[in-house]
């Protein structure tokens, strides 16, 4: 069994989403001896943002510069990691009302027409179903249902939309929010998220 662990936070050891995503991976390792884990730190080793040159360079028989070819091959590697994974764990902080740009760059490499989705007579069809996806969404403020800022939350909502688009319709999402509202609020949010991580089912 293969697990892909992706972190999008820029805060390193101070990151709540990283702390909780690591706890999830540790729990799954304990539950699945022999679990193969691939880790992508998208802040430590950022992916280049998708460009027109790379889109063109990925076409059959394209003639690429070395830089573009390297980017094309990196994109293929990222996509293959995702396709090969049985479980995907994502650390997804909310920055300025949406995902980090580092995580968005990764998403742009896994949404590939004809591979993870396709268009048919009735619209788009996801092709990447069957994976277990667990995401940790950390938020500095309060954006949950019924809060004044709920409509400004575009991390969890975006993730759910993107994953459903490629066929993953039941992601497991753990939310830690209010982490910028003081030390006590941060500790409560982190403890609650870690409790939720500890309660995840084995398979």
Swiss-Prot record:
Binding residues for FMN: 9, 15-17, 138-141
EC number: 1.6.5.-, 1.7.1.17
Catalyzed chemical reaction(s): 2 a quinone + NADH + H(+) = 2 a 1,4-benzosemiquinone + NAD(+); N,N-dimethyl-1,4-phenylenediamine + anthranilate + 2 NAD(+) = 2-(4-dimethylaminophenyl)diazenylbenzoate + 2 NADH + 2 H(+)
Cofactor binding: number and manner: Binds 1 FMN per subunit.
Highest rank taxon of the organism: Bacteria
Record key words, sorted: Flavoprotein, FMN, NAD, Oxidoreductase
GO terms for MF: electron transfer activity; FMN binding; oxidoreductase activity, acting on NAD(P)H as acceptor; oxidoreductase activity, acting on NAD(P)H, quinone or similar compound as acceptor
Disulfide bonds: none
Keyword NAD: yes
Co-factor(s): FMN
Broad class of enzyme this protein falls into: oxidoreductase
Keyword Oxidoreductase: yes
Subunit description: Homodimer.
Entry similarity comment: Belongs to the azoreductase type 1 family.
UniProt cross-references to PANTHER family, sorted A to Z: FMN-DEPENDENT NADH-AZOREDUCTASE 1 (PTHR43741), FMN-DEPENDENT NADH:QUINONE OXIDOREDUCTASE (PTHR43741:SF4)
Function, as annotated: Quinone reductase that provides resistance to thiol-specific stress caused by electrophilic quinones.
Protein name, per record: FMN-dependent NADH:quinone oxidoreductase
């Amino acid at each position: 069994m293969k697990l892909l662990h992706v972190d999008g936070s820029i805060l390193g050891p101070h990151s709540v989403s990283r702390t909780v995503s690591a706890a999830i991976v540790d729990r799954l390792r304990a539950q699945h001896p022999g679990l193969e884990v691939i880790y992508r730190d998208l802040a430590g080793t950022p992916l280049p943002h998708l460009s027109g040159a790379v889109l063109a360079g990925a076409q059959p028989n394209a003639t690429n510069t070395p830089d573009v070819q390297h980017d094309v091959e990196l994109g293929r590697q990222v996509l293959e990691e995702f396709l090969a994974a049985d479980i995907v764990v994502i650390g997804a902080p909310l920055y300025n009302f949406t995902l980090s740009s580092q995580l968005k760059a990764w998403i742009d490499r896994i949404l590939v027409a004809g591979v993870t989705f396709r268009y048919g007579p009735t619209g788009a069809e996801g092709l990447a179903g069957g994976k277990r996806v667990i995401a940790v969404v950390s938020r500095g403020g309060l954006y949950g249902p019924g809060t004044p800022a709920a409509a400004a939350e575009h991390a969890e909502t975006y993730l759910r939309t993107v994953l459903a688009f490629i066929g993953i319709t039941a992601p497991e999402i753990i939310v830690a929010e209010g982490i910028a509202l003081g030390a006590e609020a941060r500790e409560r949010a982190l403890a609650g998220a870690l409790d939720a991580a500890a309660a995840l089912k084995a398979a």
